[in-house]
């Protein structure tokens, strides 16, 4: 195949690759391509809560089978994946109403998710940043931080941003 021979390949030639998604990323440590809010296998319809990943170190293999680690998982809290932030230990996934931790587990499950908090918002895909291993984001009415637990940040900036802007 193209991955092992170095030959070219068109995206249309790859079987089961997600054709629509909200976010696409490459995991740092485990080397998977991950599509968030994407279409399911054999479907062109986007599922805004579905996460799919390619085989490890193989961007051409998206069909799960016994010889690879390609797979998928669907989140249950929220109606759409809005954004993601990669950290050293995990990928933090934001839906319109919750926050998840996504961690590489290895075969056979490959990736697992854990709900970190519900009834938590984010204003958009680019409202996330990481500094000193802490993930910060702006919700629709609060600022948040995650360093192992989700916390609401109380600060003067909050009042200015959420009360004074048009």
Task: Annotate each PLM feature.
Residues 1-31, 39, 68:
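Disordered, low-complexity "stalk" and linker segments at domain junctions of extracellular
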Residues 24-66, 71, 77-92:
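Helix-rich catalytic cores of soluble enzyme domains
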């Amino acid at each position: 195949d193209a991955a092992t021979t170095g030959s070219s390949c068109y995206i249309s030639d790859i079987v089961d690759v997600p054709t629509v998604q909200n976010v696409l990323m490459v995991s740092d440590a485990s080397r998977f391509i991950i599509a968030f809010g994407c279409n399911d296998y054999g479907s062109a319809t986007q599922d805004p809560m579905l996460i799919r990943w390619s085989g490890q170190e193989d961007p051409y293999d998206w069909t799960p089978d016994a010889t690879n680690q390609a797979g998928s998982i669907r989140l249950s809290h929220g109606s759409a994946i809005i954004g993601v932030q990669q950290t050293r230990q995990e990928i933090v996934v934001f839906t319109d109403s919750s926050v998840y931790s996504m961690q590489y587990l290895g075969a056979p499950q490959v990736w697992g998710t854990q709900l970190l908090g519900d009834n938590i918002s984010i204003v958009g895909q680019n409202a996330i940043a990481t500094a000193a291993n802490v993930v910060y984001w702006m919700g629709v009415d609060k600022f948040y931080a995650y360093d192992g637990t989700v916390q609401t940040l109380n600060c003067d900036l909050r009042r200015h941003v959420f009360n004074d802007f048009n």
